[in-house]
């Protein structure tokens, strides 16, 4: 069985050599293939602002991003200044995701944008709050509430800030293994397919 905590000396030396020389195979998504709902001069790629860097900037400047700081991960019945808030959770997810992505030579800006936006639509009180809101929403509207799908509503509806399809898809699918018990990526090639997928998530839990 593979040991993912310790790499062989040969592989470690190879990775170190590739890192120092900059000569390694890039397996990450190519920025030039990012899709957006509308063409915008503000999205032009420059040497210091690759495509997904625009998404990072737009997410952290979205008014709802500030709400991370006031949402706790759990509901506490006692005063606790050190209780974890969603802002710290998002920072940790971003850091861990970038570490893993860097080892795999993936697109780190794409990874960071997904990580920073992945809980934008989350309720307070962690998944218990989400479950309760889903029950209320479905009882009154016949539709389901899912925090990852609500994150899409925030970034693509409430604030239509032209986030790329690749980032939105990553946010929408970030907890698919919880709902489905497994996650098999399905490539998306258009916003039409993406919108149909999002609508199906409201109707089918």
Predicted regions and their residues:
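Sequence-structural signature of the catalytic-core scaffold of metal-dependent phosphohydrolases
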Residues: 2-44, 61-66, 95, 103, ...
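Active-site flanking loop/helix segments enriched in acidic
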Residues: 40-47, 51-60, 66-88, 197
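Short secondary-structure transition/capping motifs
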Residues: 48, 82-90, 121-122, 140-144
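Short amphipathic alpha-helical segments, especially helix-boundary/capping motifs
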Residues: 70-75, 106-111, 128-131
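Residue-level signal for alpha-helical context at structural boundaries
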Residues: 74-77, 111, 151, 169
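Alpha-helical phosphate/pyrophosphate-handling elements in metalloenzyme active cores
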Residues: 79-110
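A generic hydrophobic-helix recognition signal that picks specific residues
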Residues: 111-112, 197
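Short alpha-helix carrying the canonical HExxH Zn2+-binding catalytic motif
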Residues: 112-117, 121
């Amino acid at each position: 069985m593979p040991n993912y905590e310790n790499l062989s000396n040969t592989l470690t030396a190879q990775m170190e050599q590739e890192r120092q020389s900059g000569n390694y195979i890039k397996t990450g998504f190519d920025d030039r293939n990012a899709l957006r709902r509308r063409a915008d001069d503000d999205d032009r790629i420059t040497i210091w602002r690759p495509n997904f860097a625009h998404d990072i900037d737009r997410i952290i400047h979205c008014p709802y991003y500030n709400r991370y700081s006031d949402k706790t991960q759990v509901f506490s019945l006692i005063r606790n200044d050190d209780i974890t808030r969603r802002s710290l959770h998002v920072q940790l997810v971003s850091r861990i995701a970038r570490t893993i992505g860097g080892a795999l030579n993936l697109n780190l800006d794409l990874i960071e944008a997904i990580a920073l936006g992945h809980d934008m639509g989350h309720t307070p009180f962690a998944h218990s709050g989400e479950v309760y809101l889903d029950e209320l929403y479905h009882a009154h509207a016949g539709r389901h509430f899912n925090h990852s799908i609500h994150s899409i509503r925030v970034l693509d509806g409430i604030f239509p800030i032209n986030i790329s399809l690749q980032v939105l898809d990553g946010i929408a699918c970030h907890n698919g293994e919880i709902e489905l018990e497994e996650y098999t990526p399905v490539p998306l090639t258009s916003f039409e397919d993406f919108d149909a997928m999002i609508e199906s998530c409201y109707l089918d839990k």
